[in-house]
UniProtKB/Swiss-Prot annotation:
Binds 1 zinc ion. Its cofactor is Zn(2+). Keywords: Cytoplasm, DNA-directed RNA polymerase, Metal-binding, Nucleotidyltransferase, Transcription, Transferase, Zinc. This is DNA-directed RNA polymerase subunit Rpo10. It is found in: Cytoplasm. It comes from Methanococcus maripaludis (strain DSM 14266 / JCM 13030 / NBRC 101832 / S2 / LL). PANTHER family: DNA-DIRECTED RNA POLYMERASES I, II, AND III SUBUNIT RPABC5 (PTHR23431:SF3), DNA-DIRECTED RNA POLYMERASES I, II, AND III SUBUNIT RPABC5 FAMILY MEMBER (PTHR23431).
Length: 68
């Protein structure tokens, strides 16, 4: 679905770095290094990035909207 604004567990704002994460991931960088550079330290916040589906630069939300 749509990337959450805050971490579900701790409530930290994580959406502010999502676009940079997505761009760097698309360029082939290692997800661990990206999260370290963006200073996403907590496991719960890192989980939010790792578990968010990105397939061919499309999010799950893009697929669902087609079936309105």
């Amino acid at each position: 679905m749509i990337f959450p604004i805050r971490c579900f567990s701790c409530g930290n704002v994580i959406s502010e770095v999502y676009e940079e994460y997505r761009t760097r991931l698309k360029n082939g960088e290692n997800p661990e290094e990206i999260l370290n550079d963006l200073e996403i330290k907590k496991y719960c916040c890192r989980r939010m990035f790792a578990s968010h589906r990105l397939d061919n630069d499309r999010e799950l939300f893009d697929d669902i909207v087609e079936y309105k």
